[in-house]
Amino acid sequence: MEVDINGESRSTLTTLPFPGAEANSPGKAEAEKPRCSSTPCSPMRRTVSGYQILHMDSNYLVGFTTGEELLKLAQKCTGGEESKAEAMPSLRSKQLDAGLARSSRLYKTRSRYYQPYEIPAVNGRRRRRMPSSGDKCTKSLPYEPYKALHGPLPLCLLKGKRAHSKSLDYLNLDKMIKEPADTEVLQYQLQHLTLRGDRVFARNNT
C-alpha cells in the first residue's frame, strides 16, 4: 500500500496497523494487569490522529510514534524484516519510557534542591530566582543536573551570590561616568578585572 508521507491521506496513516502491536499486546496484558479496565495505565492501544500510543506507564508518561514512523516501520516489515520490526517497538517504548522517567526524576531533583527565593525588584514586583549551582544546597548532588538540560552555565551563575553582588561594584561605574575618561584609570581597572578573573579560574580548577 502506497501512502503519501506529506500527510495528504492522513486517515490511512491512522488506521495503519502497528507491526508488533498485536504480537506484544497479549504478553503485555498478562505482565501488567491493570487494577480495573478504566485505569489509564491499562495496555490498550489507541490511535490519535496520526500518532499511536505505544505505552503508558503508571506515571501517565506516554510514548508516541508519528504516522511517518509507523509508515517506515510498515515498509520495513513488508521488506521481510518482521522479527526486527517486532523487536523495535518494545525497544523504542522502553527508551522513551527511560528518557521520560529520567527527565521527570531530574525535574524532581531540581525542584527539591533548587528552591526559588525572592529578589526585591526595582519596580516593586517581586521576582523569583533559582539559586545557581554554586550554592551550598547543590553540593550534595552526585551529578550535575544542569548539564543535562542545557549547556554549561556562565561563570557568574556558577560562582553563586558573591559574583552577583561583587561583579560590578568594585568598578565604580558611577564615578567613571561622572569623571572624564582617564586612560591610566581605565587601564588599571582593566588589569584588575583580568587578574581577578584569572584568580577565579585558578580557584575553580583547584
Curated annotation (Swiss-Prot):
Keyword Transferase recorded: no
Region (Disordered): 1-41
Cysteine-cysteine disulfides: none
GO BP annotations, alphabetical order: cilium assembly; epithelial cell migration; fibroblast migration; inflammatory response; negative regulation of cytokine production involved in inflammatory response; negative regulation of epithelial cell migration; negative regulation of fibroblast migration; negative regulation of inflammatory response
Modified residues (N-acetylmethionine): M1
Post-translational modification remark: Phosphorylated.
Signal peptide per UniProt: none
Tissue: High expression in normal macrophages, monocytes, and cultured rheumatoid arthritis synovial fibroblasts (RASFs), with lower expression in B- and T-cells, and little to no expression in other tissues and cell lines.
Primary residence: cytoplasm
Free-text function comment from the UniProt entry: Regulates the macrophage function, by enhancing the resolution of inflammation and wound repair functions mediated by M2 macrophages. The regulation of macrophage function is, due at least in part, to its ability to inhibit glycolysis. May also play a role in trafficking of proteins via its interaction with UNC119 and UNC119B cargo adapters: may help the release of UNC119 and UNC119B cargo or the recycling of UNC119 and UNC119B. May play a role in ciliary membrane localization via its interaction with UNC119B and protein transport into photoreceptor cells.
Self-association state and partner proteins as the record states: Interacts with UNC119 and UNC119B; interaction preferentially takes place when UNC119 and UNC119B are unliganded with myristoylated proteins.
Family to which the UniProt record says this protein belongs: Belongs to the UNC119-binding protein family.
Matches recorded under PANTHER family: MACROPHAGE IMMUNOMETABOLISM REGULATOR, UNC119-BINDING PROTEIN C5ORF30
Protein name: Macrophage immunometabolism regulator
Native source organism of the sequence: Homo sapiens
UniProt lineage: Eukaryota, Metazoa, Chordata, Craniata, Vertebrata
Gene name, Swiss-Prot/TrEMBL: MACIR
